[in-house]
Structure formats: C-alpha cells, structure tokens
Amino acid sequence: MKATTLTIMATRGEDQDLVQQTAVSLSAKKSQSTTDRVVPCFGWHPWFSHQILDDTAQPTAAQSPAEHKSTHYAAVLAPSPADDQPFIDLLPVPKPLSELISETRNRLQQFPNALVGEVGLDRAFRLPSPWTPTDIDNRDDQLTPGSREGRRLSNYRVKPEHQRTVLKAQLQLAGEMNRAVSLHSVQAHGGIFEVLKELWAGHERVVLSRRKRDKQRDAEGAVSGDDEGDDEDKTPIGSQSTKSSDPDGKSYPPFPPRICMHSYTGSVEPIRQFLHPSNPSDKVGDVIKALPEDRILIESDLHVAGAQMDELLEDVARQACQLRGWELRHGVQVLADNWRRFVFG
C-alpha cells in the first residue's frame, strides 16, 4: 500500500468499536513518523438513523419496551410500518440519541485528531428487507454485520426530519469538540445547508457592499485602495462562546470548523450557496472547476485498503489535475495540503 494514512469512517453500531480498535492497534505499531497511520472517524450514517431514538423530545406515555420500540419505528419511518409488526420485530432496539452523543464524545476525546463521520442526510435510500433464514445461512461471516449485503429493498425510508435531528446533534458535537466532519448528502443539499444555517445563526460574517466599504474607509481616514481582499472586510457577529469539552479548555462555535462534502454529486449552484462569503466557512467536473483550489479533497471511498485503493486515489488525483489544469506534481501537493488542513486544522 502506497498511501501513508487511512481515514476510516464509522457508520453504524457494528463498526464504531472496530474503527476504534483499528486506530489503537495501528497507532501503537507506528514508526517514528509524526503522522498516525489511521485517522479514525466516528459518526452515525443516515442509512442507519432510524436506529436512533430521539430521547431529547417530549417523553411519551409509559410503555413496555416492545411498545416503545414499535412507537419509535412507526414515527420515524415512512410509510409508517405500524401495520407491519413482523418488519418492526426484526429491527434492532433503538439507541437513545443522548447515548450515541456521549459515546462519540468519549471516542473523540481518546483520539485528538479523530473526525466526526460519516454523517449526513439521504432522501433516496430505502431500508433493506429483513433477513430471512436463508439470508442468514448464506451471509459472509467476514463482513461486518449491519449492511445490506444484497438484500432486496423495502418500501420504507427514514423521515427527513428524523435524519435532521440525528445529524444536527452530531454536528453540534463536532463544533463542541472542534472537529472536522465528513458529510454524506444525497438529494438533500438544501437540507444540509439549512441544518448548518441553523447552527451558525448569530455567527454569520458581515459582507459589506463596495459602497459601504468605501464609506467605512473614508470614515476611518483610510486611503481608498483596491476593492479586493474580501476576507479583511468580513466581521464576525454574535457570541462565539459555547461550552466545550476540548481538553485545552477553549470554547468553540456550535458548528464544525471544517466540512467535507463526501462524494458530492450535486450541481454547482448548491456549492456556491455553501461557499457564499456570508458563511463562516460534466456535473462533477463543473463542481471541481468551480471550487476554490484549497477546497478540493479526494478519496477512494473503498471498503478495503491496498493496491486497488491506491489505483483509485491515483486515478481521481489525475482527473482533478486535468480538470483544474494543474501540473501533476503541483496538483498532488495541493491535494495533500488540503487533506492535512482539513484533518488537523
């Protein structure tokens, strides 16, 4: 394997501990290099968000565990499976959201460079059909449980509002811990933007028009010069203090410091919305061309490490360089610098 560091995402209950164990194991065996072999990422993917119970909502009437489980899934899935008890019976007992956030916080504290991910919104996916006895007998035991593994899809989807609740809690944790986030977004770019907008409300930058900038310079007795340098004209407003669990005791805004739009497949327009100056921070080809140079990351998005992963990383790096008109050595250096800045700040 040529890649020196793996950024490994957790997605569901079955792989949080596996990512943690892998990071511990490889970090213990690393050489004198200052870069860890693994950057672990902890989060709950939207495909599994139905397994999370929002215990921050109004308490429900006293129910048995079985009734509580049925009520939860009937509320968060669409269409409601209230009349499909066999389907509900085969779903796992939901995990309280507060428990997920507490566990993720502990894992982030263990790994100072860990990220939050993979999290997000997905309006397209459907839950797979329950396991049949034949499916169980024929499944590959080498695979981590919890994924689809070829099962047919059901008609059930997770309601967008429930996905938003699970996502928002994890983004708030990322802000609290000052960690970058890997975001999954399928047919939900507007929803992602709205969640982020809610989190950074009161922290927007003020973007002055040219006329107001000139008036401000004149009022300050400054010599009117070049109109460029927008970054110097952006003035943060609103309180920047929030409670933080970061070991250094610092307080951070209630939103992630850095976000990667993982495998972005939307159009250029939503990206322009995300990159608007007021924010505190072919179709794919158009997006790569439209992005600022320091906002491009590449990935293999592969479930195994090795030669195939290296080949995919090389292929996508070459494509990015070709689209941007970069000389290969320069482009690879840009992409490497972007990754280090995204992960380590």
PLM feature segments, named:
Residues 20-37, 103-114, 274-279, 287-292:
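Acidic (Asp/Glu)-rich catalytic clusters
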Residues 10-15, 48-53, 84-99, 281-286:
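Active-site glycine- and acidic-residue-rich loops that bind
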Residues 1, 86-277, 305:
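Divalent metal-binding pocket/active-site signature
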Residues 1-50, 114-115, 180, 258:
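Divalent metal-dependent hydrolysis catalytic cores, especially in the metallo-beta-lactamase
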Residues 19, 40, 118, 174, ...:
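Conserved, mostly hydrophobic/aromatic
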Residues 294-309:
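Short acidic/histidine-rich active-site segments
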Residues 312-345:
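Mid-to-C-terminal alpha-helical segments outside catalytic/metal-binding sites
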Residues 44, 50-90, 125-156, 312-317:
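Active-site gating loops and adjacent loop-to-helix segments of metal-dependent hydrolytic enzymes
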